[in-house]
Amino acid sequence: MVRLMIQDRLMTAGMGGPLSEQVDPASLHHVLDIGCGPGGWILEAARLYPHMELTGIDISWRMIEYARAEAQARRLTDGVEFLVMDALRPLDLPGDSFDLVNLRFGSSFLLVTDWPRLLGELLRVTRPGGIVRVTDGMTTQSNSPAYDRLFQMFLCALYRSGHSLTEEKAGVTHELDRLLSETGCQQVQTKAYMLEFVAGTVGGKNFYEDSRFGFQTILPFLQKMGCASEDYDALYEQAMIELQQPDFRVIWPMVTAWGTKPA
């Protein structure tokens, strides 16, 4: 939970806000977030765009309860709804309902073979003329040799588990525009972001915390896929040292792809 909240802050701030590429957020009134986790994206959108009615769905009761509590604590409950729902099954939502449907980091829970079906569901619940928006990350580039080795193990596990098309690139990020077009979206566009995190800054500290939690949490997954090296623990400790060096920096490329549903 802590890691997801940290990661959410990293992404949203680094990309300039929850909908920075959209020309006219004021025209978006009904918005759906798929796999909302602890609700960070929804709550930031609610803060910036109080006219919106926002719905977040996630398979985890724990995530949804946390998101609801956060909405209460931040006094953002008006127009905000969080529902328990499995995105890998047909969505229990009416068709043609949302002005924008958002999905971030889908590769974390979608197999490569799952993408066409889910994107079809996103298109179904989007109103004619509405937007399907997908964001995912690419391979990080850092000056920490230990961190880079850990990340390569993560890429290995994503590929072997069926979440990536290749072992060199994370997920299906480089294919998002094609997938949207093949689903039936029109006017598909993409925007690339280069999120840079530097030691001694708030972003650098958040990246360190995200990495510290993340590489602890995913170790069983790496081991199951046969991608964790025997020196993993020592490598992890070395990476945490390198991430706190004054000259540490990392670039985390992101891509947002979006398209409209035919009228």
Feature map (PLM): residue ranges:
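C-terminal helical/coil "lid" or tail adjacent to the Rossmann-like core of SAM-dependent
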Residues: 145, 153-157, 189-250
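Conserved catalytic/acceptor-binding region of the Class I
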Residues: 131-205
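A short acidic, Gly/Pro-enriched loop at the edge of an enzyme's catalytic core
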Residues: 91-100
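Class I SAM-dependent methyltransferase SAM/SAH-binding core
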Residues: 30-34, 38-90
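Core SAM-dependent methyltransferase catalytic element
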Residues: 183-186, 252-263
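A short SAM/SAH-binding and catalytic strip from SAM-dependent methyltransferases
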Residues: 99-114
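Conserved alpha-helix/loop element of class I SAM-dependent methyltransferases that forms part
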Residues: 3-30, 44, 48
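A short glycine-rich, Lys/Arg-flanked "PGG" loop and its adjoining helix->strand segment in the class I
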Residues: 116-128
